Amino acid sequence: MKLLGDTFGQRIRFVGLQGSFGRGEATEKSDIDMVVILDAVTAEDVRSYNDMLNLLPNREQMCGFFSGKNELRSWEASDLFQFYYDTTPIYGSLDELLTVLDDAAVRRAVKIGACNIYHGCVHNMLFDKSEEILKGLYKAASFVVQAIAFRETGKYIRLQKDLLEVTSGDERKITETFLGLKSGGEVQFDEMSELLMNWAQYWIQNT
């Protein structure tokens, strides 16, 4: 925070953490997903933020989101669902985003997520045939399951392992598969790809 304050001063509107650090699940290899929102952002601000990040000893782990407040307010609402609920505030608040996070936004998050996963899965089955891509698609699917669970329960389940308590059917299978892959489980490419493709296909047609 001190470096941020020295760089941007009172222009800072929000600072938070996303990802494994935000959820308290970080390991030594985890990326540090910082969210920094300023009053406004110019290309010069991006360069200044880059210079600030270069001063950090763990620069290679730094990633995240850097934006002006007006851009965030006008962002695609379906993207803001995961953004809001997966961000742990350090300074400031994102609560004003709640005004756009209605059921339509969450429904759209499910639909867009399923479409992207379906395309990525079929493309990977045909062309890339990559286990790493499949793992990434299951990670993306776990976020869609969070949105599905939110629509069904009204609660955001932040930790994927806790989704097992509120999901059933294919949502539970998707979550179990993701957690298994995350812990180093063996990739069964054809079987896992088919499960993911069929699951995404269902939500494209039923959302």
Q: Where is each model-derived feature located?
A:
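N-terminal loops that bind phosphate or other acidic moieties
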Residues: D33
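Catalytic core of pol beta-like nucleotidyltransferases
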Residues: M1-D6, Q10, G22-E28, D39-T207
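Short, glycine- and small/hydrophobic-rich beta-strand elements in well-ordered beta-sheets
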Residues: Q10-Q18
